[in-house]
Every structure is written in structure tokens, then in C-alpha cells.
């Protein structure tokens, strides 16, 4: 079994004042893409969620070049997730002395980038397991109408 170098870096943004549903709409577009392609997509999309995600992707790439010394052309977004954060509750004053509750949602965004040039070691145990696996399995065919099935039983 070969030990693999750590090839992943991450950037985490917490308490971003935005709905998690709106941030997921942008995150789904960039998951699995390269770093340069992601920056182009985020600059051209017209959503408010693009700017904090752009900053996180840029920060993750800076972490990769600082910590591992990797080139930005080799980076790929391997995992991107949006989690629901705390909800800030405020009051909106209305007519006749009434007030309504306003909920301001927040979200936590995690961007994990992987350097594909450092992925040169392969785990030998996983290769032997997949080769030993049986290739074809025979499935028995049961026809429920020919043997009566459960229709004739009470």
C-alpha cells in the first residue's frame, strides 16, 4: 500500500449573509470544473452569490500555491458544498404599533480543490479488489404467473 501525498486544499466561508438555496444554485454550476474555467463562469453569472464564491475559490487557489507550491492550471474543484447557517432574527416595524419578524438566513460554503498533477500514486489494494470481482452474475428468472404466485392463496 502506497502512501499518497495530500493533494487537496480547502477554503471555508462561514456566516455569509445569503440563503443556502441561492448559493447552491451557483455551486452546482462549478462543481468538478477546473480553476480557470470556474473563474470565467463566476465572473459572467449574474447572481449575487457569485462574488463570495469567487473569493473562496481564489482563496483556495492561493492556499494551494502557498502550502503545496502547485500551479493554478492543475487545480480542479473536487468538492463544493453549501450548508445552512444560523438565522438572524430582526423586527420590522409596521403600522398601528405592530411589528413583524424578519429572518435573515446565513450559509457556510466549503470549497475543496485538488491538484491533479500530484495524483500519481495509486493504491494497489483497490486495484486487486476490482480485478478479483466476479464479472457476470446470473440472475434467476421467476415468472409469478406460471407458478401461480400469491393469487391462488388466501
From Swiss-Prot:
The keyword Chloroplast applies. Disulfide bonds: none annotated. Its main location: plastid. It holds the Pfam family Ribosomal_L22. GO terms for biological process: translation. InterPro entries: Ribosomal_uL22 (IPR001063), Ribosomal_uL22_bac/chlpt-type (IPR005727), Ribosomal_uL22_bac/org-type (IPR047867), Ribosomal_uL22_CS (IPR018260), Ribosomal_uL22_sf (IPR036394). Keywords: Chloroplast, Plastid, Ribonucleoprotein, Ribosomal protein, RNA-binding, rRNA-binding. The keyword Ribonucleoprotein applies. SUPFAM superfamilies: Ribosomal protein L22. GO terms for molecular function: rRNA binding; structural constituent of ribosome. Transmembrane segments: none annotated. It comes from the Eukaryota. One of its GO terms (cellular component) is chloroplast. It is found in: Plastid, Chloroplast. This protein binds specifically to 23S rRNA. Part of the 50S ribosomal subunit. Belongs to the universal ribosomal protein uL22 family. This is Large ribosomal subunit protein uL22c. The lineage of its organism: Eukaryota, Viridiplantae, Streptophyta, Embryophyta, Tracheophyta.
